[in-house]
UniProtKB/Swiss-Prot annotation:
UniProt-recorded name of the protein: Small ribosomal subunit protein bS20
PANTHER family documented for this protein: 30S RIBOSOMAL PROTEIN S20, SMALL RIBOSOMAL SUBUNIT PROTEIN BS20C
Alphabetically ordered keywords of this record: Ribonucleoprotein, Ribosomal protein, RNA-binding, rRNA-binding
Gene: rpsT
Coiled-coil positions: none
Organism: Shewanella sp. (strain ANA-3)
Length: 88
């Protein structure tokens, strides 16, 4: 339990940031799941559109520090490869 005034403030800030990050992480997962669902359905057009919407979100989360930039690149590369395989 936080005893000093500054420790209490830091605890409040930490909780606020945790909730904000959880919301953003959930949004990121939702966008990625939409792409995966379209790929599993075999719908190339929908998958491409969902990927186009998800790509800037993934990049933004990497910029904000929510996920590592390499993880963002890996997400995008793997999803894009699956979409290209769907077209072939």
């Amino acid at each position: 339990m936080a005893n000093s005034k500054s420790a209490k403030k830091r605890a409040l800030q930490s909780e606020k940031r945790r909730q904000h990050n959880a919301s953003r992480r959930s949004m990121l997962r939702t966008y990625v799941k939409k792409v995966i669902a379209a790929i599993k359905a075999g719908d190339h057009k929908t998958a491409t559109e969902a990927f186009a919407a998800a790509q800037p979100i993934v990049d933004r989360m990497a910029t904000k520090g929510l996920i590592h930039k390499n993880k963002a690149a890996r997400h995008k590369a793997r999803l894009n490869a699956k979409i290209k395989a769907l077209a072939a």
